[in-house]
């Protein structure tokens, strides 16, 4: 039985699609700009789900991050991709999915030299079912109050993904400024 190759959408600097490439080939030291997404999932009490990336992940293994991220397949609707990835990574059904940062873009290099270079719209959603993460994706998870997450990220940014440290000041500007995290949003994204 042939193995399925996951493709990502390659973009030019204006965000226009210029092609596709196998996901396994785009996260390198010369990562091409590509399309992704991030999602911040909340529970009924308003707590945010943070996940610790599995140690086996290629990029930023073992660091804490937002609820989940992913890449839409070519010609896949972005909302469908968010729902698909929530189920695949966290065994989670979402409701009230909302686009909150449509133009988020960043470029970052991890300790191994692997580069993330993404136009990465950010979504917010509410969990409709319990979390049941896949261990190859998520090492552990916690539901936390956003007001507690922000100072944790500000004091130990090395323990969190760079995209989360850049997204939080944009999502919670007042809390981030108070915690000293607001300056992270000023870091050039590309």
UniProtKB/Swiss-Prot annotation:
Coiled coil: none annotated. Its EC number is 5.3.3.2. Binds 1 Mg(2+) ion per subunit. The magnesium ion binds only when substrate is bound. Mn(2+) binds at residues 27, 34, 71, 116, 118. Residues 32-166 form the Nudix hydrolase domain. GO terms for biological process: dimethylallyl diphosphate biosynthetic process; isoprenoid biosynthetic process. InterPro entries: Idi_bact, IsopentenylPP_isomerase_typ1, NUDIX_hydrolase-like_dom_sf, NUDIX_hydrolase_dom. It is an enzyme of class 5 (isomerase). The active site is at 69, 118. NCBIfam families: IPP_isom_1 (TIGR02150), PRK03759.1 (NF002995). Belongs to the IPP isomerase type 1 family. This is Isopentenyl-diphosphate Delta-isomerase. The gene is idi.
